[in-house]
Regions:
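Short, small-residue alpha-helix embedded
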Residues: 53-56, 107-137
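Ribokinase/PfkB-type carbohydrate-kinase core domain
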Residues: 1-44, 49-97, 128-129, 137, ...
Length: 184
């Protein structure tokens, strides 16, 4: 519930803890206004194109306007996934765009967005990136998080089920396949 989310965010703020949020379309459609109010306390937001459009009330065809609106609502990083087209990330100062890693054998897209979101947050945590204010992020850390997230999503769609293909830290670190990704 959004009442509980508000309490969690208050406590996180009191403890100086970063909060990542990946709301579902159902949560967005049921409590858009409440969620918008909560964004001021969110450090990392991960949504897909449709969720970003629902949240902002702006068609994702106007991508720059969507990011401008989201950046104005929250202090942290916004990542908008675009399925097989990749991701766009804004830290309020820079916008990063990346495609996906080539899939060896796509089996099941279930959980790909969640795999991306968890990989993205893991990448930020691993680099100790906080980004509590717009424009304070280290671009190298954002790019690392995008690469880890994309690798995690790619590995996940190559296995059946939502979690079977998730990468371990070791499998990401040792895989030559995921070392280079074009990020503009």
């Amino acid at each position: 519930s959004y009442k509980l989310l508000g309490k969690v965010l208050q406590e996180a703020k009191r403890l100086n803890v970063s909060v990542a949020l990946n709301p579902s379309f159902k949560h967005l459609s049921e409590g858009r206004r409440e969620l918008i109010k909560s964004l001021k306390d969110i450090s990392f937001l991960v949504v897909n194109e449709g969720e970003a459009a629902t949240l902002t009330g702006i068609s994702f065809k106007k991508e720059a306007a969507v990011f401008k609106r989201l950046d104005s609502l929250m202090p942290g990083i916004v990542a908008v996934t675009s399925g097989a087209k990749g991701v766009t990330v804004s830290d309020g100062r820079f916008v990063y765009k990346a495609g996906i890693f080539p899939e060896k054998n796509m089996v099941d897209r279930t959980g790909a967005g969640d795999a991306f979101g968890s990989g993205f947050v893991a990448g930020l945590l691993r680099t100790e990136e906080v980004c509590r204010e717009k424009g304070t992020c280290d671009p190298k850390n954002i790019e690392y998080a995008i690469r880890l997230a994309s690798a995690n999503a790619t590995a996940n769609v190559e296995r059946l089920g939502a979690t079977e293909g998730l990468l371990t830290r070791s499998s990401f670190d040792t895989s030559k396949r995921f070392r280079v990704m074009k990020i503009t």
